[in-house]
A protein has these predicted regions:
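N-terminal glycine-rich FAD/FM-binding segment characteristic of electron-transfer flavoproteins
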Residues: 1-195
Length: 195
């Protein structure tokens, strides 16, 4: 199975080499100012254009807030299935993507197949797949594409961006935490947390 990546954004061509370093053979690049900030409409139009043109068997999207938004819009437009929050993926001998995800409140695991439509689409939770060793010497093919989309064609306008990302000593990565303790305003103060 050949691995390809889609890179969409504004001045993001440098990310193509990163994709090659982690195993992509091809990168489909859409690089334009209209993609500067994530908005559903331009991104899903770009992905749908690429899927309709190149006909991939499988499309995987990270199960992040933005990834879930994008994958849902793309699957709806393409009239294909989408398995959300997969915790396991495999390809069987008939080239079906075996998409495993928790069901019924996490009490059982369900394996889902998309038999009749293409592409087979999944959003994938973090840490489901092993990260391959980075090989900066790997090269691949960049396929530049564009769609005739102007800023005035997009219904949602970005008026202001407020950066809420902390860096340095203030940064907290809860995705890597083994235990997270949380409480609401009813706790009144941190002193009321007794573990």
């Amino acid at each position: 199975v050949e691995l390809s990546a889609i890179v969409i954004g504004d001045r993001v061509e440098n990310l193509c080499q990163e994709s090659f370093a982690y195993g992509a053979a091809k990168v489909y690049l859409m690089d334009a100012p209209v993609f500067h900030h994530y908005r559903t409409q331009p991104y899903y139009e770009a992905v749908c254009y690429l899927v309709n043109k190149y006909k991939p068997e499988i499309v995987l999207v990270g199960a992040t807030g933005l990834g879930r938004d994008l994958a849902g819009a793309v699957a709806t437009e393409l009239k294909t299935g989408l398995t959300a929050d997969c915790t396991g993926l495999a390809i069987d001998d008939k080239r079906f993507l075996l998409q495993t995800r928790p069901a019924f409140g996490g009490n059982i695991m369900a394996t889902i197949l998309t038999e009749r439509t293409r592409p087979q689409m999944s959003t994938v939770r973090p840490h489901v797949m092993l990260i391959p060793n980075k090989d900066t010497s790997r090269q691949g093919q960049i396929i530049r594409e564009s769609i005739p989309l102007k800023e005035e064609d997009i219904a949602v306008k970005v008026l202001e961006v407020i950066d809420d990302h902390r860096s340095g000593a203030d940064a907290i990565d809860i995705a890597a935490a083994e235990v997270i303790v949380s409480g609401g305003r009813g706790m009144l103060s941190k002193e009321n947390f007794h573990i």
